[in-house]
Every structure is written in structure tokens, then in C-alpha cells.
């Protein structure tokens, strides 16, 4: 078969299927999504998979944790010898620079984690013997993915390391430090890691910059920014953790973060407030339009139904009302739940 394999958060398969269908139609490539709710992945079947993958950049996909081009689908694998049919299916392929053996991040997929680990150890030497895998990982070469959907059912796929998630399953393994004020700190950590390139992080998040955190309490996002030595105005009627204030980089204003505005322009504004997504999109657009900040990261809490439609509406609303030339990226992060995280950067 030919198509794209994209991983997603369990339960968001319809949103990813709708996104892939809409984006493929926009670039003029015909295809259809194959998925079931709670699978943790979507197959977008099309004849021009490589061309579609080139047009749909991983960083631009909202609900996809990972983006892969399918090479083959193997069913009825013999548990005693899965390697032989995989080698046969890969015959004629160029050499790969790495191998990741995976499973969907779903209730049905997680029990396959042990198989994925052990099979990867068995498959690597066989691939090297066949001339299909380098001795050491080489990022400049395509990366081979084997995704087990069941013990006898696997998808073989390939990734461009420069246009795919650099983590197995598309999940960055971030550790919640004991001093983090809340688990929400992981969301901003992941947003900075996922939505910005390494070069952008170095250029746009510098010591001495000034930021506002709207709806800051108890201080998770503020704490993440202070670890980058950014000066933060934390706006919330609720309290911040004492050790966050003790950094000397934080000014706590007891005010309504949704209506507060700064006295002078800031480098960054971040916001993780529980509010209707369209209201948030409009308020964030006001911040950009009025020049109150150059860059922003904010969350949009999605409704239970028509989440892809609401996502498109909110992003369109934000860009229209911002009235600025922006680079906008959005992702449903691993540490997000019923929400997406949006980055907007001025040039």
C-alpha cells in the first residue's frame, strides 16, 4: 500500500483524519483516511505519498505526533519468523540510517511495547547483514520505522529525519522536576522543544528578555521561563509558589490576566487560561495587533465535538485579527489534553 502513517493522541483520530484529508485536498492530492477511534494512528491512503509528505511538513501538522511514508503493510506474520517477510518487503530499498520499532500509543498498542523492544534487537543485525542498515545511526539517511499493530500485523514506513519528530512514537520524554509548580510546566517545555527549531530557540528565547504569563498561578509556565533567565510579569489573582517568586525574575500582579495589558512592549506573552477558544484567539490577536508582544505561545481548549472545525476557525480568526505578518504553528502536544498549543512569531 502507499500512503502516510501519522501517530496521534488516542481519541483524536477523527481530527487527524479530517486534517490530513483537508490538507491533501488543498495541495491537490487525492486520497482517503483509514482509521478507527482510539487506534492512536491514522493511515492516509494515496498514490502520491512521497509527494504529499513533502508538501505536508511535520511541524505544520496539528494533530500528528509523527509523520511517516508507508512502504508496506504485512499481515499474518509468523511469530516464529517475522524477519524474513520484512527483509523481503524491504528488498530494493536504499540503506537506512536508523531503525525504530514502535507501536501505537493506545490501550491496544501499549501491550506491544515488549515485542517492539525485543524485535528491534533481533532485526537490527539482520538488516545490517542485508546491507539495509548502517552500523551506527546516521541522521542524513532515511529512518526505518516498524510499527506493530498486533503481533502478526506490522506497518513498514520511512521518515526523513529533518521532517519528522525526533522521538520514538513522536513523544518527547520530559521529566517533571520536583521544583516544578505544576504539571502544566511540561506543556510549555514541550512547546518550546516542538514548535521551535533549535536555531529559533537560541535566537528567540534569550536571558534578559521580558515576558508576561497570563493566568499564571500557581506558576508552572512562569517557572519554565525563569529557567531561561527571562524576566516575567505573572498576572493572576491567585497565588504563585514562593520559590518561583524567589528567583528575583518575577513580578506578580494580582489582576485578571484576560484583560490586563502591559505598559510597554514585551518579547513574549504566554497564556494557558481556561476560557472559550474563540475568546482566547481574539484576545491573543489583540496582543499581537497592538504590539504588546512580539511572540506568543497560548493554549486553545477544544470542545468535545467538531474539534477540527473549531481549530481551523480559531486559527483563522487569530491570524485575521492579528493583522501582522506572522509565522503560526500549532500542535496537540503529548502533554496537552483536550487542547492545542499555538505559537505565533513576528518576523
Swiss-Prot record:
Example of a GO cellular component annotation carried by this entry: cytoplasm
Domain of life (superkingdom): Bacteria
Any one GO molecular function term: S-adenosylmethionine-dependent methyltransferase activity
Pfam families: FtsJ, RlmM_FDX, RLMM_N
Chief location of this protein within or outside the cell: cytoplasm
UniProt function note: Catalyzes the 2'-O-methylation at nucleotide C2498 in 23S rRNA.
HAMAP family: 23SrRNA_methyltr_M
Protein family according to the UniProt entry: Belongs to the class I-like SAM-binding methyltransferase superfamily. RNA methyltransferase RlmE family. RlmM subfamily.
Name assigned to this protein: Ribosomal RNA large subunit methyltransferase M
Organism this protein belongs to: Xanthomonas campestris pv. campestris (strain B100)
Amino acid at each position: 500500500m502507499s500512503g502516510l502513517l501519522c501517530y496521534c493522541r488516542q481519541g483524536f483520530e477523527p481530527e487527524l483524519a479530517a486534517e490530513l484529508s483537508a490538507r491533501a485536498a488543498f495541495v491537490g492530492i487525492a486520497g482517503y483516511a483509514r482509521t478507527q477511534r482510539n487506534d492512536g494512528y491514522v493511515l492516509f491512503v494515496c498514490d502520491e505519498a512521497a509527494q504529499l509528505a513533502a508538501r505536508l511538513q511535520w511541524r505544520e501538522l496539528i494533530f500528528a505526533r509523527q509523520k511517516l511514508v508507508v512502504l508496506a503493510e504485512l499481515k499474518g506474520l509468523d511469530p516464529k519468523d517475522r524477519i524474513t517477510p520484512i527483509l523481503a518487503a524491504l528488498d530494493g530499498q536504499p540503506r537506512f540510517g536508523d531503525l525504530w520499532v514502535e507501536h501505537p500509543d493506545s490501550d491496544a498498542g501499549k501491550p506491544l511495547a515488549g515485542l517492539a523492544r525485543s524485535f528491534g534487537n533481533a532485526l537490527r543485525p539482520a538488516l545490517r547483514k542485508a546491507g539495509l542498515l548502517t552500523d551506527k545511526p546516521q541522521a542524513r539517511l532515511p529512518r526505518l520505522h516498524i510499527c506493530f499493530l498486533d503481533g502478526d500485523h506490522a506497518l513498514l514506513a520511512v521518515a526523513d529525519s529533518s521532517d519528522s519528530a525526533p522521538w520514538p512514537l513522536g513523544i518527547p520524554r520530559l521529566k517533571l522536576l520536583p521544583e516544578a509548580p505544576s504539571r502544566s510546566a511540561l506543556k510549555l517545555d514541550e512547546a518550546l522543544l516542538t514548535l521551535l527549531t533549535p536555531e529559533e530557540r537560541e535566537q528567540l528565547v534569550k536571558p534578559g528578555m521580558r515576558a508576561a504569563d497570563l493566568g499564571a498561578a500557581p506558576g508552572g509556565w512562569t517557572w519554565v521561563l525563569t529557567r531561561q533567565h527571562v524576566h516575567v510579569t505573572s498576572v493572576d489573582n491567585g497565588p504563585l509558589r514562593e520559590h518561583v517568586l524567589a528567583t528575583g525574575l518575577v513580578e506578580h500582579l494580582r489582576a485578571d490576566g484576560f484583560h490586563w495589558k502591559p505598559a510597554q512592549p514585551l518579547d513574549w506573552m504566554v497564556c494557558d487560561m481556561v476560557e472559550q477558544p474563540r475568546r482566547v484567539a481574539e484576545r491573543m490577536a489583540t496582543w499581537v495587533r497592538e504590539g504588546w508582544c512580539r511572540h506568543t505561545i497560548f493554549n486553545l481548549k477544544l470542545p468535545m465535538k467538531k474539534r477540527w472545525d473549531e481549530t481551523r476557525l480559531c486559527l483563522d480568526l487569530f491570524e485575521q485579527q492579528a493583522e501582522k505578518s506572522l509565522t503560526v504553528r500549532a500542535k496537540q502536544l503529548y502533554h496537552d489534553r483536550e487542547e492545542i498549543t499555538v505559537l505565533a512569531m513576528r518576523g
